[in-house]
Curated annotation (Swiss-Prot):
Belongs to the iron/ascorbate-dependent oxidoreductase family. GO terms for molecular function: flavanone 3-dioxygenase activity; L-ascorbic acid binding; metal ion binding. It comes from the Eukaryota. Its cofactor is Fe(2+); L-ascorbate. The keyword Disulfide bond does not apply. It comes from Malus domestica (Apple). Residues 191-295 form the Fe2OG dioxygenase domain. This is Naringenin,2-oxoglutarate 3-dioxygenase. Catalyzes the 3-beta-hydroxylation of 2S-flavanones to 2R,3R-dihydroflavonols which are intermediates in the biosynthesis of flavonols, anthocyanidins, catechins and proanthocyanidins in plants. It catalyses: a (2S)-flavan-4-one + 2-oxoglutarate + O2 = a (2R,3R)-dihydroflavonol + succinate + CO2. Residues 348-364 have a biased composition (Basic and acidic residues). Pathway: Secondary metabolite biosynthesis; flavonoid biosynthesis. Fe cation binds at residues 218, 220, 276. GO terms for biological process: flavonoid biosynthetic process.
C-alpha cells in the first residue's frame, strides 16, 4: 500500500509525529553542524602513478580504514559538472508534488523507486528521510520503469554517475587489495559480479530534530560505500560503540568513503566497518547520495588475507546472502529485546505507582 503523504508535506508541523520519536538513548548527542576534523581528507591526485604518489596515498587510506573505517577523498576524478547535475536534479525531484513522487512508490516489494521514511522490519520508529533508490549494476538488473522520469534528464545523468562511481570504487578497492598483500583486483573479484545501488536521501527540515534521526545508527552490509553530501551537515560517526559521536565536516565536491561489513570481513577485521548515523535539523533540508558497492548474492564471504599470529574471524565461508540474513536477524532480535525491555519498564513503573498509593486508595 502506498503511503498517504510525504515528509515534505508535514515538515511545517510544529510537533514531531510520535512514529518518528526515538528512545532517549538513540537521540542525537552532537549537533548536525558541530563539525569535527578527525575524519581524514585524502587527495587522490597521483593515485595512478605506480612509482609516484600511489604508495603515499595507499598508506593514508589504510590508516583511515584501520582507525575509523571512514575517510573523505578529493581530486578523485569524478567530473564536478556531473556531480552538480546529479545533486541539482535530485533536489528538483524532491521538490515535486507528492503525487508525482508517489508514482514511483517502492512499497510492496518493488525493485527501486521512491520511499517515504524507512525503518527496520519489526521496529515501530521511523527515520526522518525520503529516498529514491536506483539499482544500477549489474546493468542487466536495471529496471528503468522504476527510475523516476522527472526531472527529464535524471535517468541519463544517473547512468553516467553510476559508471563513474563504479570505476572510483574499484580503484579504491585496488588500493586496499594491495595493502593486504594481494593482487590489485582481489577485492573486486571477491565480489564476483559487483552490485551497485544508488540511494538518494532527502532529509526535510524537522520540527523537533533533537527527538529523531534521519537515519538510525548502523553499519553498511556491503563492501564499500561512497557518499556525496551537501554542505549542511548531518553525517555522524562513532568508533567507541556509540559512547561519543562526531559530525563529519562537509567538504565541497568530496566523497565520504566508508567500509561495510563485507569489506571488514574480507580484511579479517583489519579494516573497520564504519559505525554511523544521520541527524537532521530545523533550519534547512539536507541532501546526500550514497552509492553502495556490494558483492553478488552468491559471493563467498571469508577473509582473503590473515596476518601472522591472527586467526580467521569467520569459522567457515558463507555466502553474502547468508551473511546479510544473519545481520538482519541480529538487528531484529536486538529490536525485539529492546521492545520487551521497554514493556517491562512500563509495567514496573505502573506497579510502583500502585505500591506507593495509600492503603485507603488501593481498596477504595
Amino acid at each position: 500500500m502506498a503511503p498517504a503523504t510525504t515528509l515534505t508535506s508535514i515538515a511545517h508541523e510544529k510537533t514531531l509525529q510520535q512514529k518518528f520519536v526515538r528512545d532517549e538513548d538513540e537521540r542525537p548527542k552532537v549537533a548536525y553542524n558541530d563539525f569535527s576534523n578527525e575524519i581524514p581528507i585524502i587527495s587522490l591526485a597521483g593515485i595512478d602513478e605506480v612509482e609516484g604518489r600511489r604508495g603515499e596515498i595507499c598508506k593514508k587510506i589504510v590508516a583511515a580504514c584501520e582507525d575509523w573505517g571512514i575517510f573523505q577523498i578529493v581530486d578523485h576524478g569524478v567530473d564536478a559538472e556531473l556531480i552538480s547535475e546529479m545533486t541539482g536534479l535530485a533536489r528538483e525531484f524532491f521538490a515535486l508534488p507528492s503525487e508525482e513522487k508517489l508514482r514511483f512508490d517502492m512499497s510492496g516489494g518493488k525493485k527501486g523507486g521512491f520511499i517515504v521514511s524507512s525503518h527496520l522490519q519489526g521496529e515501530a520508529v521511523q527515520d526522518w528521510r525520503e529516498i529514491v533508490t536506483y539499482f544500477s549494476y549489474p546493468i542487466r538488473h536495471r529496471d528503468y520503469s522504476r527510475w523516476p522520469d522527472k526531472p527529464e534528464a535524471w535517468r541519463e545523468v544517473t547512468k553516467k554517475y553510476s559508471d563513474e562511481l563504479m570505476g572510483l570504487a574499484c580503484k579504491l578497492l585496488g588500493v586496499l587489495s594491495e595493502a593486504m598483500g594481494l593482487d590489485t583486483e582481489a577485492l573486486t573479484k571477491a565480489c564476483v559480479d559487483m552490485d551497485q545501488k544508488v540511494v538518494v536521501n532527502f532529509y526535510p527540515k524537522c520540527p523537533q530534530p533533537d527527538l529523531t534521526l534521519g537515519l538510525k545508527r548502523h553499519t553498511d552490509p556491503g563492501t564499500i560505500t561512497l557518499l556525496l553530501q551537501d554542505q549542511v551537515g548531518g553525517l555522524q560517526a562513532t568508533r567507541d560503540d556509540g559512547k561519543t559521536w562526531i559530525t563529519v565536516q562537509p567538504v565541497e565536491g568530496a566523497f565520504v568513503v566508508n567500509l561495510g561489513d563485507h569489506g571488514h570481513l574480507l580484511s579479517n577485521g583489519r579494516f573497520k566497518n564504519a559505525d554511523h548515523q544521520a541527524v537532521v535539523n530545523s533550519n534547512s533540508s539536507r541532501l546526500s547520495i550514497a552509492t553502495f558497492q556490494n558483492p553478488a548474492q552468491e559471493a563467498i564471504v571469508y577473509p582473503l588475507s590473515v596476518r601472522e599470529g591472527e586467526k580467521p574471524i569467520l569459522e567457515a565461508p558463507i555466502t553474502y546472502t547468508e551473511m546479510y540474513k544473519k545481520k538482519m536477524s541480529k538487528d531484529l532480535e536486538l529490536a525485539r529485546l529492546k521492545k520487551l525491555a521497554k514493556e517491562q519498564q512500563s509495567q514496573d513503573l505502573e506497579k510502583a505507582k500502585v505500591d506507593t498509593k495509600p492503603v485507603d486508595d488501593i481498596f477504595a
